[in-house]
Amino acid sequence: MPIRKSNTYLSLVNSYLIDSPQPSSINYWWNVGSLLGLCLVIQIASGIFLAMHYSSNIELAFNSVEHIMRDVNAGWLIRYIHANGASFFFICMYLHIGKALYYGSYKSPRVMLWVIGVIIFVVTMATAFMGYCLVYGQMSHWGATVITNLLSAIPFIGKDIVPFIWGGFSVSNPTIQRFFALHFLLPFILAALVCMHLMALHVNGSSNPLGITGNVDRLPMHPYFIFKDLVTVFVFLLVFSLFVFYSPNTLGHPDNYIPGNPLVTPPSIVPEWYLLPFYAILRSIPDKLGGVIAMFGAILILLTLPYTDRSFIRGNSFKVLSKFMFFLFLFNFILLGNLGQLHVEVPYIELGQYATAFYFAYYLLIVPAISSAENILYYIGTKK
């Protein structure tokens, strides 16, 4: 017996990366998972090196970032890798979620896989938000103030939670220090969740574009899919390098190069681009508590999909109505992202409210209605 099968630890690697049977029909959308793993490794590695030189004292935070950029050997490179790595992490994550929505990867028997994936998404957003606050530029300070203030909308306990998080009466030194501690801890929790995600995936294996269970026609992970993954890894590294070396601040905000000043409010307060769709949903609801519920509900509503999608057939590859509504939903999500960075004024307010209504209607009304209608058509077709 080869050592990769007989050794206790290597046998785990073997069962996941070498002999793992994969459907022969999976396409390049299934490669995004490996890119997410690469992004997580890049973020943890670059983050550890940045933490060696970063100071979480509010008086020194901004200057310590500038010290990394100017005085530390290759500090500018590590900082830009970490900053752009966060953006690319979310690009890959949104692609991964989009693939799952299109191909029905959330349906039974992969519900646990989907639930863990949504938890990973939530933890990643929390980690990214706290990391953005650590730079302590203008947008960091005011972003931290606005987002943490949202918790004051929670009935009865909200007014007490906000000072508890701040460690005072405003965003101050204790806030940045606890954000730094949590920002350092959460990626390792993310890594543990990713291991759980892989374990859940290993139980039933990957789905496929056809939406059928193809246990007969499978290929080993190595060499076929390992080399296929390497193709997208090299393409990813090429595009990532173009941003890091030639356009490192494109995905950032210029106001964050101004030191945080609680006495000067920026013309518009916007979070990083990957949080904008949910920020637009928050702003589209006039009531503060309603907006907070809508924003968190917009993320957690992903958990309802395994139950609201009643279709017999997994995925949208052969379903015209579902495919059309999915691409309409995709356009709507991109529209929300654009509205999140615009000023709160007419006509963007009304447009944001319509887009928010469609976002929730897709999960709660459109998916159940269309899946039920397609089931009837499927039943009529098979009877004939």
UniProtKB/Swiss-Prot annotation:
GO terms for biological process: mitochondrial electron transport, ubiquinol to cytochrome c. Coiled coil: none annotated. A ubiquinone binds at H202. One of its GO terms (cellular component) is respiratory chain complex III. Heme b b562 binds at H82, H183. This is Cytochrome b. It comes from the Eukaryota. Fungal cytochrome b-c1 complex contains 10 subunits; 3 respiratory subunits, 2 core proteins and 5 low-molecular weight proteins. Cytochrome b-c1 complex is a homodimer. It is found in: Mitochondrion inner membrane. Its main location: mitochondrion. Component of the ubiquinol-cytochrome c reductase complex (complex III or cytochrome b-c1 complex) that is part of the mitochondrial respiratory chain. The b-c1 complex mediates electron transfer from ubiquinol to cytochrome c. Contributes to the generation of a proton gradient across the mitochondrial membrane that is then used for ATP synthesis.
